[in-house]
Structure formats: structure tokens, C-alpha cells
């Protein structure tokens, strides 16, 4: 039902839900190097976490990577979310950095919490962000759905003519439809992000008519 709200009824609908922008989560930035007003991926150990009263209820977690301190703030959160921020665990997040005096803060970042022995690997491609409107569908879920659809196209082993007949596209690029879809949903850090953001990348030209 949530997929229907954004016009996804078939595999090709999901594949042609093109990203509106991308985030670079292929690298980590030390807390001491975080710049206010810009988005970064950061990581640190949870030193403190608490729900703040009175006034507007909010949650705060303070983390450090050994180079500095960062405060994570949540204003809309569940009990389970707050409970997950256990002191001693580590968190990797992505969000726009703010300042409150000399204090570095980030509001509602996307994040993963993990034990130091189970540190997740960094992404090796740019992370796509999709227009999901007011649906309850999360970016994480949308990315997983599209990954599964890409796998299905790969496993069907269709040739270019068969894929073109499905999508009713005219060839306007040297890329195949399959390669264009893979590139547009998971571009490498070497891809020209300026061209991608202005819809002038060859993968987009292959798909957009």
C-alpha cells in the first residue's frame, strides 16, 4: 500500500523511481574535522545518553571518536530508540552538523548502533535518496526494495531488446538499460556528481526520454 502511494505497482516502477540526490557514506570524517552547515558521516563511542525533561521532550547522546565530542539530538523518538543508545556501544551516523556555542550537534541523523567487535563496513558506492512523499516507507526500505528489483532483472538474464521492450525506451546512450539502472541507483564515488545532480549523466540520459 505504501508503495502504491508513490506509484510503484510493478518492478519497472521501482527501478524508475530515480534518486533525487546522493549522500557520500563511503568515508568517515573525524569529529574534529566536522564543519557546521555541511553533511558528514561520523562515528564514535557512546559516552552518555538520556531523555531530557522538562519542556520539549528530547533525547541526547554524547559520542567521541578520540578527536572530539558530538551530541546527537532526537526530538521524535521511541522508547526502543532511546534504549538502544547504550553507553559503551558505538554509533555511525550521517547528518548535517550544527553548533550550539562551542558544542557540535547533529539532529535526527540516520545512524547504526553496533558493538566495537561488529563494526560495519563502509559503503563502496554513493547512497541514493528517493522522493517518498508522506509515506511511511523509509529510505532504508526503499533502497532494499530497489536492490531486490535490480537483482531480479539480473537473474532474469534478459537481453537488451527484451529489456527495451519492457521499458519501451529508445537507445540514446552507449550504456545498456541494465547498466544504466545499476549505475543510477548506486553510482561510484568516481562518477561525476555534478552531472548526476543536473540530470546530465549518461546513465540518466539512457533512462530519461
Predicted feature locations:
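Upstream accessory/linker segments immediately N-terminal to the RecA-like ATPase cores of bacterial MutS
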Residues: 52-59, 64-209
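A common structural microfeature
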Residues: 11, 39-41, 69
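OB-fold nucleic-acid-binding modules
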Residues: 17-47
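Helix-hairpin-helix
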Residues: 1-9, 14
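Short, solvent-exposed coil/turn linker segments
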Residues: 10, 27-31, 176
Amino acid at each position: 500500500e505504501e508503495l502504491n502511494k508513490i506509484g510503484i505497482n510493478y518492478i519497472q516502477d521501482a527501478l524508475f523511481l530515480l534518486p533525487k540526490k546522493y549522500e557520500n557514506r563511503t568515508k568517515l570524517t573525524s569529529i574534529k574535522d566536522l564543519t557546521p552547515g555541511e553533511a558528514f558521516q561520523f562515528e564514535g563511542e557512546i559516552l552518555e545518553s538520556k531523555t531530557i525533561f522538562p519542556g520539549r521532550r528530547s533525547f541526547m547522546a554524547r559520542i567521541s571518536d578520540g578527536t572530539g565530542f558530538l551530541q546527537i539530538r532526537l526530538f521524535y523518538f521511541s522508547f526502543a530508540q532511546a534504549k538502544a543508545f547504550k553507553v559503551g556501544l558505538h554509533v555511525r551516523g550521517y547528518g548535517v552538523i550544527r553548533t550550539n556555542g562551542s558544542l557540535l550537534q547533529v539532529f535526527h541523523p540516520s545512524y547504526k548502533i553496533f558493538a566495537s567487535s561488529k563494526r560495519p563496513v563502509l559503503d563502496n558506492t554513493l547512497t541514493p535518496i528517493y522522493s517518498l512523499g508522506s509515506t511511511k516507507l523509509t529510505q532504508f526500505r526503499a533502497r532494499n526494495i530497489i536492490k531486490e528489483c535490480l537483482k531480479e532483472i539480473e537473474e532474469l538474464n534478459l537481453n537488451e531488446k527484451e529489456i527495451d521492450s519492457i521499458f519501451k525506451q529508445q537507445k540514446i546512450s552507449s550504456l545498456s538499460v541494465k547498466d544504466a539502472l545499476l549505475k543510477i541507483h548506486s553510482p561510484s564515488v568516481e562518477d561525476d556528481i555534478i552531472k548526476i545532480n543536473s540530470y546530465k549523466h549518461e546513465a540518466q540520459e539512457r533512462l530519461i526520454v
